[in-house]
Every structure is written in structure tokens, then in C-alpha cells.
A protein has these predicted regions:
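Short glycine-rich anion-binding loops that position phosphate/pyrophosphate groups of nucleotides
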Residues: 19, 89-92, 111
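Alpha-helix C-terminal capping/helix-to-coil transition sites in glycosyltransferase folds
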Residues: 78-80
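Redox-cofactor binding/interface segments in oxidoreductases and associated redox assembly factors
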Residues: 86-87, 106
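Phosphate-binding/catalytic loops
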Residues: 95-173
Length: 173
């Protein structure tokens, strides 16, 4: 990304099933990106449906879900991505090489669908995922993308993947 595109930055979020984490990240970035970013999401092994708790957590957080079912990478490999961000370890391992040399980063998040326990505990896990994704995306949006060289930008985008629930949503860069 040596030059600033004349279009919004394109971001692809990847996870295994495209049923929770990547869908959540896509919805949040599209809500907060202010037209500067356009996000999509996909899975390496798409699930049959989006987890209803992911949709509920987004809705109750005031974020509109895109409404698309889980999908794979078909039709997405030839798009001109500026950023490809994996949000689960399995997707990181299976992440293909995209044309155009996008900035690739890993923002691993626990799978909220793996949480066991009662309904409230499961629901809380999805809200925690929305909170963590929102914090990371806020940091991402604070990066001065127009002023950073590709290598510096890639380093900073990757570092966002280390942000935890306990850190503030935005910090000086």
C-alpha cells in the first residue's frame, strides 16, 4: 500500500466458520469506519449459519449485522484487499496468499461459541467478543494509514492483535 487508494480501504476478516468473530469484526468496522474502510468477512470452512448470539450481541450493541450467511473465499481471492486480518488461529494457519500484497495481520480471539455453561455465560462470551473486536478496531481506525509506510503500518496493525479486554480502546500512536 505505498500509495493511498482513491477508494475506501478494503478489509477482509477471516475465521474458520464465518459464523461469529469475523462477522462481528466486519459489522463493527463497517459501522465505525466512516466510509474510510469497507469490510467483508469469510471463513476457511464456512458454517451452516451465523450464530444467533453473535447477531444478538451486535444488535444489542447498536451495530447492524450485514445479514449475509457464512461464506468461503470463493469470489474474494481476486479482490484488491488492503488488509487481511485473521481472527482465529485456525484461519491464520489456513490463510492463503492474496494477490496485491495486502497487509496481513492476526488478531486472534477466543471463539465465543466454545464457551460452556448456562445461557447467560454463553451470551456474555459473545458480548465480550464484540467488546474486544471494538477495542481493536478503534485502535486500527486511529492509525494514520495515509502517513505510514507499508512496513510500519503492517507492524502496527499486527500489534493490535495483542490488545486485550483490559486495555483502553484508543491510545496515542
Amino acid at each position: 500500500m505505498p500509495t493511498i487508494p482513491s477508494r475506501p480501504f478494503r478489509v477482509l476478516f477471516l475465521c474458520t466458520g464465518n459464523s461469529a468473530r469475523s462477522q462481528i469484526a466486519e459489522a463493527i468496522l463497517n459501522r465505525l469506519g466512516g466510509g474510510r474502510f469497507v469490510a467483508e468477512s469469510a471463513g476457511s470452512q464456512p458454517a451452516a449459519r451465523v450464530n444467533p448470539l453473535a447477531i444478538e450481541a451486535l444488535r444489542e450493541s447498536g451495530i447492524t449485522w450485514a445479514g449475509h450467511p457464512p461464506r468461503g473465499l470463493d469470489g474474494l481471492m481476486d479482490k484488491d484487499w488492503d488488509f487481511v486480518i485473521t481472527v482465529c488461529d485456525k484461519a491464520k494457519e489456513a490463510c492463503p496468499i492474496f494477490p496485491g500484497q495486502p497487509v496481513v495481520a492476526h488478531w486472534g480471539m477466543p471463539d465465543p461459541a466454545d464457551v460452556e455453561g448456562d445461557a447467560e455465560r454463553k451470551r456474555t462470551a459473545f458480548f465480550d467478543t464484540v467488546t474486544l473486536a471494538s477495542r481493536r478496531i478503534s485502535l486500527f481506525l486511529a492509525l494514520p494509514t495515509e502517513k505510514l509506510a507499508k512496513l510500519a503500518l503492517e507492524t502496527r496493525v499486527r500489534a493490535i492483535g495483542e490488545v486485550t479486554m483490559d486495555e483502553p480502546a484508543a491510545r496515542e500512536g
